[in-house]
Amino acid sequence: MAKAKNEVPAVANPDDKLKALEAARLQIEKQFGQGSLMKLGNNSAIGNIEIIPSGSILLDEALGIGGYPRGRIIEIFGPESSGKTTIALHAVAEAQKQGGIAAFIDAEHALDPQYAKALGVNIDELWVSQPDTGEQALEIAESLVRSGAVDVIVIDSVAALTPQAEIAGEMGDSHMGLQARLMSQALRKLTAIIGKSNCMIIFINQIRMKIGVMFGSPETTTGGNALKFYASVRLDVRKIETLGKDDDEAWGNKIRVKVVKNKVAPPFRKVEMEILFGKGVCPYGSLLDSAVKQEIIGKSGSWYSYGDDKIGQGRPNAVKFLEENIDIAQKIEKELREKLFPGRPFVSSFVEKTKEQKEAQEKAVEALKKEEGSKEDALTGNKDETDDSAQKNSAASKAKRAEVVGLPADDSLF
């Protein structure tokens, strides 16, 4: 009986199996190129994941590997004004500190250059695009990734990636699933080249409510389900409370970040951070809390000590000490990262702020104060600031600010 044309021969001998596998590998590499098939242990790009720090040692710890993985897709989602763009801009600043090139695709047309500068972003070296359509935004992202020169790309946001057909149509026209199909097609093209170029793409996304959900969470993200599958890390950012809202002025938000998906480390870790208006996440408070947790900084009563030296009584004074002594902060950070992430190369997140960054912070804070003041005037009419009780509330607010966040009670740093 003749053998079938497509019959696969059975190989029983182990040596013959290895020879057959080697012949198959050579044939695959001849057809598809060098490196198309390899053993996992021989691929250093897969075994050793490079990272970009998040700008907060607490968030780096929650991510499990010391930061965001390069060559992967990251999704940051949450309600409005929860700190999504702030977290993404901190990642951009950290990439630039390592000598990387960053791009920001501003689909919402809402990027504030002064605020980005206040967070440490070098806006002179930041590539920015404000596309008109979703197709244009994703094609720009693909071109940047294919160049192999860009380290991180931020797309703000998925909800603003409007398909061309929707823009060309009339107001009120139904475009069922159009954006989801656009995202699915784009991610299929992007996911392979992202890994080869070692570029990281951060998608900022909004949440919506599903109608008719009786059980479980009614929340979902925009753009369909494709991004949920292709993302290696998904961060759920929520605002817990507004700091200072019970006093005369709000000066920050306390947020909770939950790693709801993580393909490079265990997921579902949570971290709480304070975001200061006009300044972003305070890294020194995060460093102090993490170092105390890992017993690198000792805490006895209200006193904090590093080695044999006391660095401050109370959290505000300890944070102020670290901010004024960046060399000690860098030394503590190095010890902390070596303990949490052994084998990872160390690049400090703490650098002396330039004069331009300090001025940008002051401008951002003043702009926020004016904005809050105009809103208050519109709601309450003429505002009286001569009342003694208002002055007492102001003093109490500053004292509370110093206690919670770790800044001095005066206005020198706010």
UniProtKB/Swiss-Prot annotation:
The keyword ATP-binding applies. GO terms for molecular function: ATP binding; ATP hydrolysis activity; ATP-dependent DNA damage sensor activity; damaged DNA binding; single-stranded DNA binding. One of its GO terms (cellular component) is cytosol. It is found in: Cytoplasm. Its main location: cytoplasm. InterPro entries: AAA+_ATPase (IPR003593), DNA_recomb/repair_RecA (IPR013765), DNA_recomb/repair_RecA_CS (IPR020584), P-loop_NTPase (IPR027417), RecA-like_C (IPR049261), RecA-like_N (IPR049428), RecA_ATP-bd (IPR020588), RecA_C_sf (IPR023400). Keywords: ATP-binding, Cytoplasm, DNA damage, DNA recombination, DNA repair, DNA-binding, Nucleotide-binding, SOS response. One of its GO terms (biological process) is SOS response. ATP binds at residues 78-85. Residues 361-384 have a biased composition (Basic and acidic residues). The keyword Coiled coil does not apply. It comes from the Bacteria. SMART domains: AAA. Residues 361-414 are annotated as: Disordered. Pfam families: RecA (PF00154), RecA_C (PF21096). Can catalyze the hydrolysis of ATP in the presence of single-stranded DNA, the ATP-dependent uptake of single-stranded DNA by duplex DNA, and the ATP-dependent hybridization of homologous single-stranded DNAs. It interacts with LexA causing its activation and leading to its autocatalytic cleavage. PANTHER family: MITOCHONDRIAL DNA REPAIR PROTEIN RECA HOMOLOG-RELATED, RECA. Belongs to the RecA family. This is Protein RecA. It comes from Treponema denticola (strain ATCC 35405 / DSM 14222 / CIP 103919 / JCM 8153 / KCTC 15104).
